Amino acid sequence: MKHKLTIMFLLVAFSIAAYAQKSTTLLYGPNDNGRTYTSLEEALTEPQNVYRLKLTKLPARDSLPAELFLLTELRELTVKGCKLWTLNAQIDKLQHLQYLNLDKNKLVRLPESIGNLSELHFLIVSRNLLETFPESIAKLKQLVSIDAWNNPLYVLPESISILNNTLQTLDLRQIPLTKSEYEAMKELLPNTNILFTDICECENRREHD
């Protein structure tokens, strides 16, 4: 019995290790070497072979440089801490995007065209200035997670209820929601795990803002 348990343990351990290895070496195409580019200039030297781009520094500007939208094979795009005020409407040229991270910018709205990113699974817009999402967010049928903590986001578009059975997590922590605001969101997304800051603390904080 002890011998059988040992074998079972080894099989489970091997399966977990194999899955972890597969997850960390996920490739998006035959020319994908797993590289994450950190320079737009370098990525543009071979635009059809760029699947991951992470930018944390951009020259002072309000929106993304137009050349970025030549990277039509992108699956993962991170533009973090670049002080962007606007997300270009051309974002829908990146039709294969599965992961979009716009953390720590100054975005006040998202364009309606974001709803055309039909393959998007993860949307990160934390630490911006968003007050709501565009109605077109309901078109993102493969979206499983929205990270929007620390935005002045108190209202969700009614259309988002279409994602009730697919959107697993909506992170709204560090947003001073009142009880009625939270309940309205939960009514739209009863099957979604909505993460939020303690409502009582939020109400107190907004009274003093």
Predicted regions and their residues:
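Bacterial Sec-dependent N-terminal signal peptides
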Residues: 1-27, 38
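LRR N-terminal entry segment and analogous cap-like coil->beta motifs
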Residues: 27-89, 94-98
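The feature encodes a structural signal of leucine-rich repeats
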Residues: 41, 64-66, 87-90, 110-113, ...
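Leucine-rich repeat
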Residues: 47-48, 69-74, 92-97, 115-120, ...
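Conserved hydrophobic beta-strand positions in leucine-rich repeat
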Residues: 51-56, 77-79, 97-102, 120-125, ...
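Surface-exposed, polar helix/loop patches in the mature regions of secreted/periplasmic/lumenal proteins
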Residues: 93-144, 154
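Leucine-rich solenoid repeat scaffolds
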Residues: 154-209
